[in-house]
Amino acid sequence: GPSAFLRL
């Protein structure tokens, strides 16, 4: 989900 992207 979007949260996985925010972990960059």
Swiss-Prot record:
Subcellular localization(s) per the UniProt record: Secreted
TM spans (from-to): none
GO CC term (a single one): extracellular region
GO biological process, one term: neuropeptide signaling pathway
Top-rank taxon, per record: Eukaryota
Keywords: Amidation, Neuropeptide, Secreted
Modified positions (Leucine amide) in chain numbering: 8
Family stated for the protein in its record: Belongs to the FARP (FMRF amide related peptide) family.
Function: FMRFamides and FMRFamide-like peptides are neuropeptides.
Protein name: Extended FMRFamide-3
Organism: Hemilobophasma montaguense (Gladiator)
